[in-house]
Amino acid sequence: MRVALVAVVAALSLSACSADPGPPPVQAKAESTAPIIAPGRPGEPARTISPDEARTAVPAPTANAADVKYVQDMVTHHRQAVDMAVLAPSRADSAALKGLASRIKDAQGPEIQYMTTWLQQQGMKVPDHHASHTGMPGMATPEQMQALKAASGKDFDRLFLTLMTAHHQGAITMSEQVLVGGSHIKIEELANDVAATQSAEIRRMREMQAGL
């Protein structure tokens, strides 16, 4: 009997030593529910979310009709702003206005190229240089553009600031609309940048208007 008992104890000990322990269930649960810090949108604070929320919180990578229309319209909108800005060096009286016009041209030129490339990548039409801008907010009429080209000195400065302020306000309106109706994260970023940059430029132009 003693020999048999010793054999049983030895077998149990060997079995215990060779067993492969599984992962601690409590630790596995803790790892799967660890919180994640998600950055907020521009102007919004970061927030804590669960892993399950994180898996569904990725912005939609696809574009919808609102995104495409915004980019197509903004290409045309930006082109007119550049057409206005390139008149300033030879017609404006104010050095500050010439500097502002140069910054507008330098900012919106690359944005036109970015938007053109994005439309091509989406397989969408890029507006030509004679595209209609009927219904776009803030666009100068052909008559207003002719008047700007004919003006010089302080008369040019006044008309330029009036037209470009309205033009910027139109771009902000368009950007606000796509932030509500669009779905593509890159276009959301673009619209936020356009709205922020042009809001700051409107404030500067109003200061310049007050000094004329």
PLM regions and their residue ranges:
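Bacterial N-terminal signal peptides that target proteins for export
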Residues: 1-5
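Sec-dependent N-terminal signal peptides
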Residues: 6-11
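C-terminal motif of bacterial Sec signal peptides marking the signal peptidase cleavage site
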Residues: 13-16
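All-alpha RGS (Regulator of G-protein Signaling) helical domain and cognate RGS-like helical scaffolds
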Residues: 18-212
